[in-house]
Amino acid sequence: MIITTNRYVVRAEYAAQNQEHIRQVMQDLRALGRTDLTYSVFVEEDGKTFVHWRICANGEARKVFDQLPSFQAFQAALTASRPEVPPISAPRLTLVGSTSDLFS
């Protein structure tokens, strides 16, 4: 299992566009219907600090995610927006427990 988390702060004027890019990624991921990856994105109270959680069952799921055109477009747009704080990745996480089965 591959678990990654990223946190960054966008400029206030880019926050709505960032959310739209995220919605597109989510729509495309749902359309794939894959059961071997889960992706959640949160925004903090300031409306411009984003936290992404990605859990992939294996390297293949991660590769599919990374190669998704909408995800690549999201990343390019985020970089071009010159965020106040660029994405910072936490060290790779190890699952200790969950209230539900992640990949059944």
What are these regions (language model features)?
Residues M1, N6-V10, P86, L93-T94:
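Glycine/serine-rich loop-strand microenvironments at binding/catalytic pocket rims
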Residues I2-V9, L37-L68:
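Short, well-ordered beta-strand segments in beta-rich or mixed alpha/beta enzyme
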Residues Y14-L37, L78:
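Short amphipathic alpha-helical segments
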Residues I3, R23-L29, F50, E84-V85:
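A generic structural signal for ordered secondary structure
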Residues E20-R23, F65-F71:
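Short amphipathic alpha-helices in soluble, non-transmembrane regions
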Residues Y14-A16, E60-R62, S98:
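Residue-level signal for secondary-structure boundary sites
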Residues L37-V51, A73-S104:
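Glycine-rich beta-strand-turn "strand-cap" elements at beta-sheet edges
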